[in-house]
Amino acid sequence: MKTSYNLRSIAAKAIAQVLDQGLSLSSVIPELQKNISDKDKALLQELCFGTLRTLPQLEWIIQQLMDKPLKGKQRILHYLIMVGLYQLLYTRVPAHAALAETVNGAIALKKPQLKGLINGVLRQFQRQQDVLMERFQNNDSRYLHPSWLLTRIKNAYPELWESIIEGNNQKPPMWLRVNQIHHSREQYLALLEKEGISAFSDDHHPNAIRLETPCNVHLLPGFNEGWVTVQDRSAQRCAELLAPQNNEQILDLCAAPGGKTTHILEIAPKAHVLAIDIDEQRLARVKENLNRLKLHATVKSGDGRYPEQWCANMQFDRILLDAPCSATGVIRRHPDIKWLRRNEDIAQLAQIQKEILHAIWPYLKSGGTLVYATCSILPEENSQQIAAFLSSMQDAQCDYQHQCLPEQYSGDGFFYALINKK
């Protein structure tokens, strides 16, 4: 059945919103997916994420094929051409269909006079593809990262930077966290097998399962009933390290969208959890996740730098601080990060992290535990941040810290520090 929309033009609009307006893909896509079929939702996501993942390559190709870049009101067609090139390079969409749908995207974008240009560029690429791809392998853009970020990663990991870049450029695996209140991991693996969904357990994380192929969450047994949550295995380590106990007072700071909040309560259902986040809109996601899993926490809006505004004289047994960060460890999940972040952001984020750490420390009980976590791979936000904190706090002792790096079949890039109050 013929659809009333052109998916390639929708993808071009999404990419324009990211690159020209600085919006995140995760904020843009849900609205654009509202009136399209489930099958096309998945393809739209593939086109948007894939185009942004390979952006430098697509830009380079266009530079080779066009004398002048499209600018101003025609800029949207530059992104449409990118979508077309991505399809030809990386998807199973038949070339003739990719070509036709991309060219028709010009009509949907009210630029029918440029159909011929788009058709010409894409056909020229088809003719020159092998030669262009061979040349690209010697180009500086081949790492698909902005130069400032590439430099930072090289400096931080002189022996490992290439494997990190490779990990960042992969499509991410889909990890699940089994809700131990309902099922053991082995029981849930059996449920997946019954549904024909191939999956693997993880020796290092007791409730983690990796799917062989990502799927729609509504195909997962008992998803709506709260039997399982989508959460990367590295993120699952946060609540595991925190080791919450029933009846304890626990603060989950920077809690949205609630994956760690709910994990804490799955481990310790009778814990008293206060979930705080500065973003009221994202707090709605925390409440949704709590409701789906039938768990209870107190959810409040608040700035981690000013705890006196939202927790009065409370004292906590354990605090989980998933600090605001560059998110350089989750680029494979959010490739737009590469183009939304700027070099100067890192120092600003490190300052915010420092302020939150110092502000929240007095609210941790003596003998209590704080887990500091980020989804960053940059030392300024991680090991260096913790070293500076420990040197300024005589009653703080770090018993464990670890940096995970993004790997193809493993977890996201993540940092953890387990700090005890003497």
Curated annotation (Swiss-Prot):
The subcellular location is: Cytoplasm
Protein's organism:
Proteus mirabilis (strain HI4320)
InterPro entries according to UniProt = MeTrfase_RsmB-F_NOP2_cat, MeTrfase_RsmB-F_NOP2_dom, NusB-like_sf, NusB_RsmB_TIM44, RCMT, rRNA_ssu_MeTfrase_B, rRNA_ssu_MeTfrase_B_ent, RsmB-like_ferredoxin
Function, as annotated: Specifically methylates the cytosine at position 967 (m5C967) of 16S rRNA.
Q: Which residues bind S-adenosyl-L-methionine?
A: 254-260, 277, 303, 322
Protein name as catalogued: Ribosomal RNA small subunit methyltransferase B
GO biological process terms held by the UniProt record: regulation of DNA-templated transcription; rRNA base methylation
Entry keywords, A to Z: Cytoplasm, Methyltransferase, RNA-binding, rRNA processing, S-adenosyl-L-methionine, Transferase
Cite the EC number.
2.1.1.176
According to the UniProt record, one GO cellular component term is: cytosol
Under catalytic activity, the entry for this protein gives: cytidine(967) in 16S rRNA + S-adenosyl-L-methionine = 5-methylcytidine(967) in 16S rRNA + S-adenosyl-L-homocysteine + H(+)
Q: Name one GO molecular function term.
A: rRNA (cytosine-C5-)-methyltransferase activity
The main location class comes to cytoplasm
Name of the top EC class for this enzyme: transferase
The family assignment reads: Belongs to the class I-like SAM-binding methyltransferase superfamily. RsmB/NOP family.
Active site positions:
375
Q: Which residues form a coiled coil?
A: none
